[in-house]
Amino acid sequence: MPRVLQILQHALFITSTALLERIRRKYSHLVFCFFKPCDRIIPKKEGKVMDTCVIFCAGEFDRLIQPIRRTDLVIAADGGLRHLTQLGIQPDIILGDFDSLGYTPEGAQVYPVEKDDTDSMLALRHGLRRGCTRFVLYGSLDGPRLDHTIANLQSLLFLAEHGAEGFLAGNRYIATVIKDSSVSFPDTATGILSVFCINGTADGVRLSGLKYPLENGQLSSCFPLGVSNHFTGQAATVSVKNGSLLLLYDRCNGLVQKEADHADL
């Protein structure tokens, strides 16, 4: 008789566990709404130092600017999972409210549709908590939602304020923000470079090696003085002593490297 009881108890345990798992899967979106596990600091993968975070958003995507490295943290933000699927790349994290994708992928971190952060911003916060300092966002600059494009441009300033650098990689252009720092372009750079003040005023602005140079100038967010500058076949530099600048340039020039913070420019 004790043996029969043991068998019954074991069967009951298995049944209960399976039932709980089914409930967890079916109502996982409610659990994530309240507990939001991505607010926790997620440990880095064993032997994988992640300084670059590559995020795929739901906007239009053409091709990669550079290969994704094994050490990159790859995040699919909602509909950005489609792009990764086409590339045959398995993301480290899948998150969002999935109103764009239309279904909830297995293992995804689910958020409510009504929230303060966009799915892209959720991904950025993830990357920052993982210690990433460089962010590349695909599907973030081209698409039918102008409001999301503007939100993504603002997120570049958010990254700069948190000591990180970010790039929106579009099908034709790349956007990035520098704060109290400088960037340089090689003499092979071509096309247009537009420079905007993204927050109030920017002082001590220097544009060199461009068709329209500027020395110790001031740019304001209420007047687009820096629009449509041009590379000239010389090495070019954009720097700002105090403030934040949004740079928009041709995609063929690749990702630039921020050079200095609070430097004596």
Residue spans of the language-model regions?
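N-terminal amphipathic/hydrophobic targeting modules at extreme N-termini
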Residues: 1-11, 32
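Aromatic (phenylalanine/tyrosine) cluster motif
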Residues: 13, 27, 32-35
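Short, positively charged and aromatic/hydrophobic N-terminal segments
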Residues: 22, 38-41, 46
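N-terminal beta-strand-loop-alpha-helix module at the start
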Residues: 50-104
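Short phosphate-binding loop-to-helix
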Residues: 109-130
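Short Gly/Thr/Asp-enriched flexible loops that form oxyanion-binding sites at enzyme active sites
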Residues: 146-157
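Short, acidic/small-residue loops that bind anionic groups at enzyme active sites
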Residues: 158-174
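Long, charged alpha-helical interface segments
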Residues: 173, 178-265
